[in-house]
Regions:
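Canonical Rossmann dinucleotide-binding motif of NAD(H)/NADP(H)-dependent dehydrogenases/reductases
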Residues: 1-29
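Conserved glycine-rich Rossmann-like NAD(P)H-binding loop of the short-chain dehydrogenase/reductase
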Residues: 24-40
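Residue(s) in the substrate-gating loop at a strand-loop-helix junction
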Residues: 137
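The beta1-alpha1 cofactor-binding region of Rossmann-like NAD(H)/NADP(H)-dependent oxidoreductases
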Residues: 35-36, 55-67, 99
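SDR active-site lid
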Residues: 170-235
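Active-site helix of classical SDR
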Residues: 117, 153
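Substrate-binding pocket helix/loop in short-chain dehydrogenase/reductase
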Residues: 93-94, 98-103
Length: 277
């Protein structure tokens, strides 16, 4: 039986990932700060055919993550797959978002994933291999307006994953980074906003996402099984990525022009409602 550790697995995308693996017969360490959510996920994992246990962990605290790693590798156990998933969002213009919100995002989104990699890599090297999936976002590729902290931290995770992919190849440790567009998940539950437009935009984007959390999870696990580096699950994400790489000036120029004319927010909402964001 293969063993996985998934952070942020008490709900949303982390839970979806756990269920995809459970149907393949995996044993999963379900990590989160939400005890009730973890217990719900555990019951669903068992019903889906997998095994598991819960582990309360605040990924923004290095000692919590290190304790989880020590426990995971204890008494000769393997960790075949680590999924760094826990994340949060703060919306607003860069200069308007309180610095404490920036720190909140950086502590969880960046440091939480770095702590995970830093704590689990030695054990994976010792056992002779493994795989790490880091959950980033298309926001890390495209840097959508009014999502500064989220963009910055997810871009950092993409860069971290690219670096680790090279460094860990010699040790038979694979690295995959998944970069989904908006889809219906529980990120909204703890999202921080500065004004009503951001609230409306976020709800519209998540509501009209073309894929479900489970569909994104299935695409992510298939990419891991093929040892791919990048996963961009939605077609629109792939389209935007190609457009940005071909002509960054056009990609950002359209948005900048719309903002200057005063209808940038209307354009953003329209794109979410037709499933283009």
């Amino acid at each position: 039986m293969s063993n996985a550790v998934i952070t942020g697995a008490g709900s949303g995308f982390g839970r979806a990932l756990a269920l995809v693996l459970a149907r393949q017969g995996w044993k999963i360490l379900i990590a989160d700060i939400n005890r009730a959510g973890m217990e719900e996920t555990l019951a669903m994992v068992r019903k889906a055919g997998g095994e598991g246990e819960v582990f309360e962990c605040d990924v923004s605290k290095k000692e919590d993550v290190q304790h989880m790693a020590d426990y995971s590798f204890s008494t000769g156990k393997r960790v075949d797959l680590l999924i760094n998933n826990a994340g949060v969002v703060s919306c607003g213009f860069v200069g308007d978002i309180p610095l404490e919100d920036w720190k909140w995002c950086v502590d969880i989104n960046f440091w939480g994933m770095l702590y995970g990699c830093h704590s689990f890599i030695p054990g994976m090297k010792k056992q002779g291999g493994g795989h790490i999936i880091n959950v980033a976002s298309s926001a890390g590729l495209f840097s959508f307006m009014e999502m500064g902290p989220y963009n910055v931290t997810k871009a950092a995770i993409i860069s971290l994953s690219e670096t680790l992919r090279q460094e860990l190849a010699l040790h038979k440790i694979g690295v995959t980074v998944t970069c989904p567009m908006f889809f219906n998940t529980h990120l909204l539950d703890n999202m921080r906003f500065q004004d009503e437009f951001q609230n409306e935009f976020a709800h519209s984007a998540f509501k009209h996402g073309r894929l479900t959390a489970e569909e994104v999870a299935e695409k992510t696990i298939r990419a891991y099984e093929k040892n791919k580096l990048y996963v961009i699950p939605q077609f629109t994400g792939k389209y935007y990525w190609i457009l940005k790489r071909l002509s960054p000036s056009i990609f950002y120029g359209v948005i900048s022009y719309a903002m200057k004319k005063g209808y940038g927010e209307k354009l953003a909402l329209f794109l979410t409602r037709i499933g283009m964001m």
